């Protein structure tokens, strides 16, 4: 951290349900030093018991904070219900019990099994020469070899119909309704994204306007999509006074019936497409977003990196007819 601070750079990491990403951002003139730091972390991690204990305490506190946020906890409860007994159903932070069971030997064994030359995606975005960058990466990581072959685990998670309730002494009720969604490579994923934006993805969406603005029944209401390699989910979430729960469910059901029976107007779809295209193009200006797109496709069993031009083409070709929005 001190070395990156001295360069005026940033270094961080995040974990999703399917992968962990370590990333850094520096001026192009500091790339050699940044690669030194990143490769040293990857090849020679400090996995000492005293460091594990420190981090265990930090993560345990994060779990306590998360448990105090029911608007967040409800999403974990939902995913546990629909993907029970699979990795997708497990919270990213873990539980107090699983964190307490880890020690340095356990983490080191995990590192040896999974941090493997056959199980890594390297992505770079910014101002660089490709041939020169490949040479630098090969210099830092080309000699990295594990003697044991990498074993890819079957991560298939079938959607399960279920219902789960968790009681807390709070003023509100937080509800999530989930429906089978689309995988990351499904050809209709962009159509679903447009549907989500129109149905519950913003303050101008049908759900927000009907239930929050017109009837004033919820504190918040929205929908979102989640896509993984072999499964997906479409989720509707709402927060409300317990007395309003039944009426909110009724209105959500009415809105679902209406959008099933009648297509969205072409003009509304056109406006939504332009909004999504603009947001996408602006997002590509971020180097972190660019490397995230590479990591999220190349490393997760997809057929390859989906260029931005393909995404824009798919969005532009979506219309309001039944075939275009058939998912």
Give the residues covered by each predicted segment.
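Short glycine-/small-residue-rich flexible loop motifs, especially phosphate/cofactor-binding loops
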Residues: 1, 208-209
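Charge-rich, well-structured scaffold segments of protease-associated domains
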Residues: 2-156, 165, 176, 182-183, ...
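Short Ser/Thr-interspersed hydrophobic loop/turn segments at strand-loop and sheet-helix junctions
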Residues: 5, 203-204
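Catalytic cores of enzymes that engage adenine nucleotides and/or redox cofactors via long glycine-rich
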Residues: 158-159, 210
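Flexible, small-/acidic-enriched active-site or ligand-binding loops
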Residues: 162
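A conserved active-site cap/scaffold subdomain adjacent to cofactor or substrate pockets
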Residues: 170, 181-185, 190-201, 207
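Short linear Ser/Thr-Pro motifs
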Residues: 204-205, 286
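Residue-level marker for well-ordered alpha-helical positions
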Residues: 205-206, 246
